[in-house]
Amino acid sequence: MIIDTTEVQAINSFFRLESLKEVYGIIWMLIPIFTPVLGITIGVLVIVWLEREISAGIQQRIGPEYAGPLGILQALADGTKLLFKENLLPSRGDTRLFSIGPSVAVTSILLSYLVIPFGYHLVLADLSIGVFLWIAISSIAPVGLLMSGYGSNNKYSFLGGLRAAAQSISYEIPLTLCVLSISLLSNSSSTVDIVEAQSKYGFWGWNLWRQPIGFIIFLISSLAECERLPFDLPEAEEELVAGYQTEYSGIKFGLFYVASYLNLLVSSLFVTVLYLGGWNLSIPYIPVPDIFEINKASRVFGTITGIFITLAKTYLFLFIPITTRWTLPRLRMDQLLNLGWKFLLPISLGNLLLTTSSQLLSL
């Protein structure tokens, strides 16, 4: 049987078309995976650069300026340096726990990004238990820190891990009560529904004004969860060398470094979602054109605008934890626990009871 040349070319073009479809299918599968990873990476690099520039301004000195324009590539240079550093293991420690600890801490924080809405219907997982899933996942991170401290076979590392666990337990309860108050106020635990509930009343409908006590408690508790000054007792340099990070080097030390800024970014994003109206642009006394209304604009422009508004609110809020680092002194361990158990817990519980009463009266 003789096959014509045109038939051979048609068969080849068909198989070439099928292979191209497979390649495009793989690319479209990878885009939703790598896009959030790239966005989170850039977000962390921007936070590191912002903190260094703001800290330099507060201390009246010159910040990073040689690595890239205005030193914006300094964090990338530090990460590259840590990537090629030698990875040391403690001779008498538990190497399995020592190696798993950083991965547990980073993974638990990365999973928190699943329920954060960056724009109108732009969320990886719109779950009915979104905010409580974040709290449940974030409670795994201290387990990784405790594993790192125990596996290092170092008294300073072990004390740092114990402090991290005690601090997380102490401040997670007030944080949860504040989130529960927001859920009662919004009649939902979905992050998307919480933002939509705030958008009904514009700027004055933000939970910042409806829950001012809860906002202050959430701010303090999130700083403690992120181990930022004045709550950086698990890694206090003057007392514990570097806490649970003492024995780490190379990429594992870099993972802890990244985890702290990832956690800070997650906390700031949740402040934006829970208290600052999320992706909605609500400016009082200033007329906003219809083009900025997410529901009325085109899908692509609305998505881009929502992402921009969410990130703008988040990075503006980041000035608070960054300036707090150079303003307040570190607390003692007893002061930290007393603040969490004797002050924040009763106040957050009272705030929850007030919110519940107001919701019942409004029925």
Swiss-Prot record:
InterPro entries: NADH_UbQ_OxRdtase_su1/FPO, NADH_UbQ_OxRdtase_su1_CS. One of its GO terms (molecular function) is NADH dehydrogenase activity. Keywords: Chloroplast, Membrane, NAD, NADP, Plastid, Plastoquinone, Quinone, Thylakoid, Translocase, Transmembrane, Transmembrane helix. One of its GO terms (cellular component) is chloroplast thylakoid membrane. It catalyses: a plastoquinone + NADH + (n+1) H(+)(in) = a plastoquinol + NAD(+) + n H(+)(out); a plastoquinone + NADPH + (n+1) H(+)(in) = a plastoquinol + NADP(+) + n H(+)(out). GO terms for biological process: aerobic respiration; photosynthesis, light reaction. The chain crosses the membrane at residues 30-50, 104-124, 127-147, 253-273, 300-320, 336-356. Its EC number is 7.1.1.-. It is found in: Plastid, Chloroplast thylakoid membrane. It is a multi-pass membrane protein. It holds the Pfam family NADHdh. It is an enzyme of class 7 (translocase). Its main location: plastid. Belongs to the complex I subunit 1 family. PANTHER family: NADH DEHYDROGENASE SUBUNIT 1, NADH-UBIQUINONE OXIDOREDUCTASE CHAIN 1. NDH shuttles electrons from NAD(P)H:plastoquinone, via FMN and iron-sulfur (Fe-S) centers, to quinones in the photosynthetic chain and possibly in a chloroplast respiratory chain. The immediate electron acceptor for the enzyme in this species is believed to be plastoquinone. Couples the redox reaction to proton translocation, and thus conserves the redox energy in a proton gradient. NDH is composed of at least 16 different subunits, 5 of which are encoded in the nucleus. This is NAD(P)H-quinone oxidoreductase subunit 1, chloroplastic. It comes from Panax ginseng. The lineage of its organism: Eukaryota, Viridiplantae, Streptophyta, Embryophyta, Tracheophyta.
